[in-house]
């Protein structure tokens, strides 16, 4: 709940049972607050860990294995407690390196007591896990450097549901509603957070404001959104539109409206190990990518032929790249087609899910053999 607003159907309820595509989901109470301020944010993290641990113990049906995902790191801790209490093998899924990424975005300095405490939790989870699933090769390398056994590490990169994300015409109802006409639309879709370097995109929009054939679209929520909106209004960046968060089922229309998708992170050595999962959805929609994330993500986009790289936080290079796409629209169309073909071959979510399931079967078999 990045805005601190809990949907009415969940308010003042300790536990809500739901079903999602045949899977039972237990939604537990959380202290929801706007994603601003370390103390309140930490309280939100801790409240979920405690409620998930409690209700997980009482209501989750018998299982063969317990999987927990991080971040945030206390989710992993909740899974570990439940697995230990039930004497079941524990699998940790690492989608971001906490608390290292907290330091990387400048939220807390290295050596801060909170960071040291999280590092203790992190090390314990790595020791306790029967298997650790990471989403990039670089994450695996970093954890091996920190003493985690390579034998328990498995790289499972994100993929895409190719049946859900299907290329569509750019003449959408959203384009009409926003009065975009045939203008070229460069979009950022996703979390508006400290890590995402969106001031750079606004700097680019401001620089290119004279181009009436170009608009910038921001879709999403996050800790930085209100500040970014205030900046747009104060500096009169009239070619930038911040839509806020839209329902997940409108994602295809958003991508279809877009001529170029922007994927950005701040300049940090840590982020060279990150692969933003949105690049797979964008490619599946046959939209070109302008990527400002170096490292593994860059290697994927360049190998696909579905996009271009500009250095993180480089306003001049990003502006030039965007103008190049505006002036030669056929280039972006061709890149989008190559990107779709590439993810269809390499990042089909069904195939990746089968590999993940093989890992879980191996964990369960090993646990039973030593029981």
Enumerate the language-model features and the residues they cover:
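Conserved acidic donor-binding segment of nucleotide-sugar-dependent glycosyltransferases
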Residues: 303, 308-315, 324-330
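Nucleotide-activated donor-binding/catalytic signature segment of Leloir-type glycosyltransferases, i.e.
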Residues: 209-220, 225-253
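A short helix/loop element that forms part of the nucleotide-sugar donor recognition site in Leloir-type
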Residues: 10-16, 166-179
């Amino acid at each position: 709940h990045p805005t601190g607003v809990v949907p009415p159907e969940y308010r003042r309820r300790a536990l809500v049972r739901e079903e999602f595509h045949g899977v039972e989901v237990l939604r537990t109470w959380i202290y929801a607050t706007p994603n601003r301020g370390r103390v309140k944010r930490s309280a939100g993290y801790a409240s979920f860990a405690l409620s998930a641990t409690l209700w997980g113990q009482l209501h989750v049906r018998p299982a063969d294995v317990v999987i927990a995902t991080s971040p945030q790191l206390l989710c992993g801790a909740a899974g570990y407690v439940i697995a230990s209490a039930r004497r079941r093998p524990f699998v940790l899924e690492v989608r971001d390196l906490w608390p290292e990424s907290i330091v990387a975005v400048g939220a807390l300095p290295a050596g801060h007591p909170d960071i040291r405490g999280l590092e203790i939790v992190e090390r314990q989870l790595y020791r306790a896990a029967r298997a650790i699933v990471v989403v990039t090769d670089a994450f695996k390398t970093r954890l091996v450097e920190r003493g985690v056994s390579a034998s328990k590490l498995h790289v499972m990169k994100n993929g895409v549901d190719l049946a859900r994300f299907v290329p569509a015409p750019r003449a959408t109802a959203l384009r009409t509603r926003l009065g975009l006409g045939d203008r070229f639309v460069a979009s950022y879709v996703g979390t508006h957070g400290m890590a995402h370097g969106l001031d750079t995109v606004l700097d680019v929009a401001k620089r290119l404001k004279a181009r009436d054939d170009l608009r910038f679209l921001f879709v999403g929520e996050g800790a930085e959104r209100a500040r970014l909106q205030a900046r747009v209004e104060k500096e009169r960046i009239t070619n930038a539109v911040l839509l806020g968060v839209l329902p997940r089922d409108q994602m295809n229309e958003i991508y279809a409206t877009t001529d170029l998708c922007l994927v950005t992170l701040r300049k940090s050595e840590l982020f060279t190990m990150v692969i933003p999962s949105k690049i797979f959805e964008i490619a599946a929609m046959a939209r070109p990518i302008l990527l400002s994330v170096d490292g593994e993500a860059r290697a994927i986009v360049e190998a696909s032929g579905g996009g271009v790289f500009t250095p993180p936080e480089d306003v001049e290079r990003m502006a030039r790249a965007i103008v190049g796409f505006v002036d030669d629209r056929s280039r972006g169309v061709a890149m989008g087609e190559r990107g779709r073909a590439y993810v269809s071959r390499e990042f089909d979510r069904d195939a990746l899910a089968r590999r993940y399931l093989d890992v879980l079967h191996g964990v369960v078999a090993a646990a039973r053999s030593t029981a």
